[in-house]
């Protein structure tokens, strides 16, 4: 049984003025292009086609809002680190992202990282930005099915050391469903809280 049986797409946003009203609780999902973010969203919500999965980096170019339940939203952020993105696209993305801390309804960030690549400089910058905004941060080391058990354990340990205190980390695979229930539980906790100090 899905924990989010009534999840639905709300709208795509290309400009700050298109943001929906600030209400309820929201959690953002972010990650590098091709990190497995869309697959993670689909696995966690138990909806195979909720977020569009593409083999082409940079496919998600807008902020996509989804309603998980009344008063609970998920925000799918554009993937970053896409080398072929035009300057105007990067400027647009930056403008949208920088407006998010003003949303008092936004309480947490799920950061999706390809476990084979590990946490990069842009991931660290995003975590620092989220911490400054007062959000809780949870890191999904996605595509864990691509590594053997020993390499997964090593990647997990390194990620924990990089993230430090205050950031939760887990291994995750949308393919074999490793960590899906743990991610769902963490998402529900974030949606129920009011700040990183809760």
PLM region spans:
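Conserved nucleotide-binding/hydrolysis micro-motifs of P-loop NTPases
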Residues: 59, 72, 79-81, 116-119, ...
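Canonical P-loop GTPase G-domain recognition
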Residues: 4-16, 146-198
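Conserved amphipathic alpha-helical interaction elements at protein-protein interfaces in regulatory
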Residues: 46-50, 132, 189, 193
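Switch II of P-loop NTPase G domains
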Residues: 19, 57-64, 78-107, 115-129
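Residue-level signal for inorganic ion chemistry
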Residues: 66, 142, 183
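Conserved C-terminal guanine-recognition region of P-loop GTPase G domains, centered on the G4
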Residues: 98-167
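Helical mechanochemical/support elements of P-loop NTPase systems and associated helical scaffolds
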Residues: 49, 62, 73, 89-93, ...
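Conserved G1/Walker A P-loop phosphate-binding module
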Residues: 1-84
